[in-house]
Amino acid sequence: FIAKWDTTQPGSANDTVVLPLVADGSYNFYIDWGDGNRDTITGYNQPEVTHQYSDTGIYTIRVVSNNMVGWQFDDSGDDDKLVEIMEWGPLRFVSDDTNLFKGCSNLTLSTTSNPPFNADAAGMFQDCSSLTGTGGDILNWDVGSVTGMDFMLAGCTSLDADLSNWDVSAVKSAEGFMSGAGLSTMNYDRVLSGWSSQSVQSGVN
């Protein structure tokens, strides 16, 4: 997992980054904080989950191991400090986590790999108002295993994308999926047309 963080954005102190790990996660990874320091993380609440820099600014943080399961901002913590995801890498999500990146208002995606979706992607990118249709290869995301999309892209005011290629055949609930998003009429029509041609679950909200 490689991402850029801006310590000066709202959240913890303006020289600090706090990882959004969760109590039911599983962790055993090295993290390179981008300033020459590394730590080993084995628990969600150990002191090293918080890192203080000597200078404020933008840092590229890298997870350099392969056991990092569990992540959730839920419109809190240092959500505004996460400004770019460059690689998803080993990051995985706990099965019942939702609202994973909710509230990350400055988040952009430069990675072209697929997010590590769970079955329930509810609120995953809700209120990520800097996401656009050109970043992260969002047009071609493989969501074929996702069953829940409630409010997944709601409030993404800069997102105007043709998502008609998404495989939504497994989706059972999509309440408020793109409520308040920046979808143009043209792309809205494309999405409706593309999805209507698929065999979808009955009774989808």
Segment roles from a protein language model:
Residues 1-205:
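Negatively charged
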